[in-house]
Amino acid sequence: MRSPQYSMPTTLALVISSLLAPNAFAEESEQDTETMIVRSTAEEALKQQPGVSIITAEDIAKQPPVNDLSDIIRKMPGVNLTGNSASGSRGNNRQIDIRGMGPENTLILIDGVPVTSRNAVRYSWRGERDTRGDSNWVPAEMVERIEVLRGPAAARYGSGAAGGVVNIITKRPTNTWHGSLSFFTNQPENNKEGTTNRANFNLSGPLAGEALTMRLYGNINKTEPDAWDINHAQNGSYAAGREGVRNKDINALLSWKMTPQQILDFSYAYSRQGNIYAGDTQYSNGNLSPNGLVDSLYGHETNRLYRQSWGLTYNGLWDWGQSKAGVYYEKTNNTRLQEGSTGRVEGMINSEDYATSRLESWRTTSEFNVPFFWLADQTLTLGMEWNHDQLDDPASMQATNSNGETIPGTSGDPTQRSTKNSATLTGIYLEDNIEAVPGTNLIPGIRFDYHNQFGSNWSPSLNLSQGLGDMVTLKAGIARVFKAPNLYQSSKGYLLSTRGNGCPNTIAEGSCYLLGNPDLDPEISINKEIGIEFNLNGYAAGVTWFRNDYKNKIVSGTEVLGYTSSGNNILQWQNGGKAVVEGLEGNLLIPVLRDVLSWRTNATWMLKSESKETGNPLSVIPKYTVNTMLDWQVNDALSANVNWTLYGRQKPRQYAEIRNETGTLATTEVGAYSIVGIGTQYQLNRDIRLNAGISNLFDKQLYRENAGASTYNEPGRAYYAGVTLSF
């Protein structure tokens, strides 16, 4: 049935008349797809661009994550796990990095809604946070699919998506009652590595026929920490191993189908994540022996995050098109033992007293999709967003005590510095999915954002898909994307200090203070990609070139703004110079035996990833990565797979940036290495599904060291097993 078509004036009138309704990017339920979709919108068309990957629930079952969804997301093209800088600090708290832009430029969504709990954790002088990121709030068994958007396709999501977007879609309510219980265990062969055990449940069904349905899930997980001496026993370093974590999650979704075309969802989630301390002290990758307090805390909980969120999401289908609306709230309490804020002891636990940082986020969004014909078939999208984030962190804002020191721009007395900071960001965007001629699709877009501190920002984009016959498609995109300053960088109350060794190496003498800066500009990246795809009878191949020209990256300052009353240097967070990230991504699918044996491969080759000022990489990532899997469907009940990942060499920083690094930096590289895994899944009967496997079959282990590129532990051989009981 052909969708209703309208002239351009009529279309604009319909959209403008509806501006007061809010929106969400939340997904429609599978059961409502046929009634909810008008025709392909710009958002849906962008998911066909070369920088987009989809991970299904079936994919997750074949390679189950140990605890964090990042375990499988990292196997997508252009994706790695790394820290937010090349310093090696917090090296085992690796997070999702897309196209070398760093974890802070990866936007995590759950059901289309941004998740920002990691922003409640203090941002260090070197640009790291003591956090596991935001990819561990949903257990693997509750995921319907994961969408990974890289490059220009992610620009529509606004601030924080300069690298890309990870959208975790949870399972929807069903029209008949269903439930499941799942159990998973991962047992490392090396007794110095932590074990994992997880259990969760899911219950879904109708409360009032198809008109009112619900879904409820709960999860509990425990991963033990690595042994305190896992690295010391190998190389003599004090670098800590991977810390453990305890997860407790509960999530409810109530879906009301008011009419076949009008759906209202209410969601609520509560999670608690607590660590099990392994001895990390931010700079434990240096030759700094932990103090007695740190030693005594091994195996204890030293920080915990409480995340609470609710949302109201509306989806409607009208004669003129489709509308979406949403209101969301998220609150994170970050409770942890207090840490130092000065020089080499920054980030080291120095007290047995707990303090709490609180981050609250309010969001409203609205979107309208209207199909019409004006010179060509097209679907116009108009969207609006309003975001307000508020941080209150007394421990971090008041940690540096320089009482008696006069510091222009702030106060040395911690009691005189504000513990709070907030930011409001309002955005409006316009997109159009245009079928210019058969086989040619254009997706122009423009986004305008207004920030209460730095003012306005424009983000234009253009994506193209051009058919070159029945088998080959050329796709390209370019977009200007941005990232707003975080609430620590822009806070007048956030003060860090160093006695001298941590000062920039351009400052010859004296101590340094680093002040927050409310006058920062947003970070900007011009993201470009062009790719070609081939599809024929189940065979598929593609290659994509990408380049991000990055400027205004916010860094700890190197320019002396003035001096304190005792002659110490005053610095502040500043917009730095330029950087460039460039690379190639490829994929190959071969149906060796149709419906029986398939071979999938993807690869990433980084051509450049460096600061144009220092030459240092933005983060430590492999030169190349290859992921391949041979998937065998033995029969209707049994399947098996072999997977192999090859990581290229990893180079450390080569250029000194702070005073105590004036000498030659360690040049130790991580050489190329590979990881092999095997897995099997068996549907025992209608209600019982089993899976088991071995990860890192050939036991290739890496140990974290004091310096160089060895900033993390690569765990060795482990055995996993899981069972799901359905009813």
Regions found by a protein language model. Give the residues of each.
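Periplasmic-side early beta-strands and strand-to-turn transitions of outer-membrane beta-barrels
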Residues: 174-297, 552, 649
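Acidic, small-polar-rich N-terminal luminal/periplasmic segments of exported/outer-membrane proteins
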Residues: 31-176, 530, 708
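N-terminal Sec signal peptide and the immediately downstream disordered periplasmic leader
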Residues: 1-66, 70-78, 199, 204-205, ...
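Gram-negative outer-membrane beta-barrel transporters
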Residues: 182, 435-439, 545-550, 561, ...
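Outer membrane beta-barrel strand-and-loop segments of large Gram-negative receptors
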Residues: 351, 361-370, 417, 421, ...
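C-terminal beta-signal and adjacent terminal beta-strands/loops
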Residues: 116-121, 551, 556, 646-657, ...
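Face-selective signature of the C-terminal outer-membrane beta-barrel domain
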Residues: 255-273, 298-455, 465-469, 596-602
